[in-house]
Amino acid sequence: TFDKFAGSSQAARAYCELDIVYEDPDIIIINKPAGMLSQPADDGEPSLVEYLTGYLLKKGDLTEEQLKTFRPSVCNRLDRNTSGMVCAGKSLAGLQFLSRIFHDRTLHKYYICLTKGKIEKPDHIRGYLHKDKKTNKVIVSRQEFKDSLPIETKYRPLGSNGKITLLEVELITGRTHQIRAHLAGTGHPLLGDTKYGDSEFNKQYIRHGVRHQLLHAYRLVIPETDQNFVAPAPELFCKIIKEENLEEAYHENLERNMGLRKNDHHSSSDRNACE
């Protein structure tokens, strides 16, 4: 259900089962499924913000009275069809902490994706990005140009079968469509990406149900608090990994990052999705 309260100052809320990776009195980290908006849109479709509000109200961590002066908010936005971890503040202190570590880049964000072709070596690529608001697409260049912003992306291949590569990406800057456009610019677009990808390559995977980019925000590291958060890949991602004989590379990387220590946390719902 979705309660929007049109024409009212009351906060909208919606209800669904959320995959909680981590939660304390101030912050919450949610494993967002592909297809869900991170933040409210103009058309009124419920987003993770409304689902979070509903979750906290139902749980009793938030009251209608508190909502008059504070509303929970997400601190990092994923594209609708990108899955993975989104951080949100449950309190003003939580929002301030998350905003600071995102701004200072003392929180490290890692993604996994499937890309066209064989990538053999790790790389640290830089460039400039400009968003065309009319088309909602970005342009990436190695040279600075008018109204462009600097971007930085690091990646390392986890495995490849020659046709497709399982890639880990560390997002240094967090611009709109950065990973998708930056990798496409290197000749290795994301599998399933209808905006920046290779349409002929994508067509080969439609029969498997791939209709969006296979990009998943799977790991967050906060050195300041010695915390490591992991959200294993969703079912469709794992299905393609298995089809392409990349399971071993995926599991080796996951086990390396999920050698859980005292302050480490991981998502529960997809923990065994690739088994």
Describe each model-derived feature in a short phrase.
Residues 2, 135-138, 150, 199-205:
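Short Pro/Gly-enriched beta-strand edge/turn motifs at strand-loop
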Residues 63-103:
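Glycine/acidic-rich beta-strand-loop module
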Residues 31-32, 87, 113, 155, ...:
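Residue-level signal for inorganic ion chemistry
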Residues 1-45, 50, 122-128:
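Conserved beta/loop motifs at nucleotide-recognition and modification sites
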Residues 36-62, 97, 114-165, 181, ...:
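Glycine- and acidic-residue-rich catalytic/RNA-contacting loop of pseudouridine synthases
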Residues 6-26, 36, 145-146, 172, ...:
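Pseudouridine synthases involved in rRNA/tRNA modification
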Residues 27, 34-36, 92-94, 117-121, ...:
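Conserved nucleotide-binding/hydrolysis micro-motifs of P-loop NTPases
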